[in-house]
Swiss-Prot record:
Protein name in the entry: Large ribosomal subunit protein bL28
Family indicated by similarity: Belongs to the bacterial ribosomal protein bL28 family.
NCBIfam families cross-referenced by the UniProt entry: L28
Keywords assigned: Ribonucleoprotein, Ribosomal protein
Keyword Ribosomal protein appears in the UniProt entry: yes
Any GO CC annotation of this UniProt entry: ribonucleoprotein complex
Signal peptide range: none
A Pfam family the protein falls into: Ribosomal_L28
Keyword Chloroplast carried by entry: no
GO BP, sorted A to Z: translation
Entry's Gene Ontology molecular function annotations: structural constituent of ribosome
SUPFAM superfamilies for the chain: L28p-like (SSF143800)
Length: 74
């Protein structure tokens, strides 16, 4: 699984851990990715999407089995 958002292309960034003694170690800041069943390129697929794209509404989630059924009120 690549650590990249399929919607916005957000990838890991490189930064530093800095201690009180100012010892510096390299580290990676990974995006908060979630595997979501969504409509992507006209198909329902599981894609890795960052939470900022989910919150912004850039992802169209796939309909579940219960959605879309019409029940009669008789």
């Amino acid at each position: 699984m690549s650590k990249e958002c399929k919607i916005c292309g957000k990838k890991p960034m490189v930064g530093n851990n800095v201690s009180h003694a100012h010892n510096v170690n390299k580290r990676r800041f990974n995006p908060n990715l979630q595997r979501v069943k969504a409509l992507f390129d006209g198909q329902v697929r599981r894609i890795d999407v960052c939470t900022s794209c989910i919150k912004a509404g850039k992802v169209v989630k796939a309909p579940t089995m219960g959605q879309g059924k019409v029940t009669s009120a008789s």
